[in-house]
Amino acid sequence: MEKISLKYVAGVMLLLKSSLIGFLVWKIVTSPNELQSLHFDKEFLLFVGAGFLAQIIDGALGMAYGVSCSTMLLGIGVPPAIASASVHTAEVFTTGVSGLSHIVMRNIDKRLFFRLVFTGIIGAIIGAYLISKILDGKIVKPYIAAYLLLLGIYILIKSFRTINDKKSNWKHAPLLGFIGAFFDSIGGGGWGPIVTSNLIDKGNSPKEVIGTVNTAEFFVTFFSTGVFIFFIGVDAWKTVLALIIGGVIAAPIGAYLIRFLSPKTIMRLVGVLIITTSTYTIYKSLH
């Protein structure tokens, strides 16, 4: 695997991304009823806002787009499967740009990339299938909210920890990739907080970890999106479009804010946001 050039990885990414764009364009063109159903109403603006806030967080922190966006969508009332499908479809575009940028800047460790990507794809496919076909959305919603709540607490605790110097270690990277992708597909987020934070905590270079994990995330989100499209379609393309619009607007702002806020401060803000919103979602689900 180490003999495979990153240029080929970038080429595959561009091919897959182009195929998804082509499919979405074809779907919209051949479904005029869906196109006519688009209304720039309050709901649409709420989705734009969710995408906007999530992208600002991700741009400043380098993770937590999915978990932040999914938490807000669940809080708004979007069903778990639709929320996860929408977030992952939008993420194909954001992670694609991010991954290609890291390849150009050579922020990637190829050995770590191939240890993550294959098990990550398998975990993403299994998780997406379960939330699409097996698990009942109404029943599983409070459990997903509880998972996001724990993830928020995890992020908050991480923000107060000092990372000690350790020898670089990615021995359990394949298992970590599977677990991160599996819960990411089911919960709509968690790949970054689970995979990135654990690899950095084990002493790996933050620069290479973020670049490698973000690039692998493109393939995770692409294949989970494929499963979602196959089983539940793209009826939620209104949500997807709103998330993309919000993310595009927020992208330069998030990159700008990173100059003024430390990563630990952002992690604390993200943790509090996720804990608060998830708690509210659980409360609504039980009453």
Task: Give the label of every model feature segment.
Residues 1-53, 59, 72-76, 104-186, ...:
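Juxtamembrane transmembrane-helix boundary motif
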Residues 61-109:
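Juxtamembrane transmembrane-helix termini in multi-pass membrane transport proteins
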Residues 64-65, 96, 122, 126, ...:
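Residue positions within transmembrane alpha-helices of multi-pass solute transporters
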Residues 68, 91, 144, 194, ...:
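Conserved active-site and cofactor/substrate-binding residues in soluble primary-metabolism enzymes
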Residues 84-92, 210-218, 248, 274:
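Transmembrane helix-bundle signature of multi-pass membrane transporters/permeases
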Residues 92-95, 149-152, 218-222, 275-278:
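Small-residue-rich packing faces within the transmembrane alpha-helices of Major Facilitator Superfamily
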Residues 95, 213-229, 238-251:
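A small-residue-rich subset of transmembrane alpha-helices
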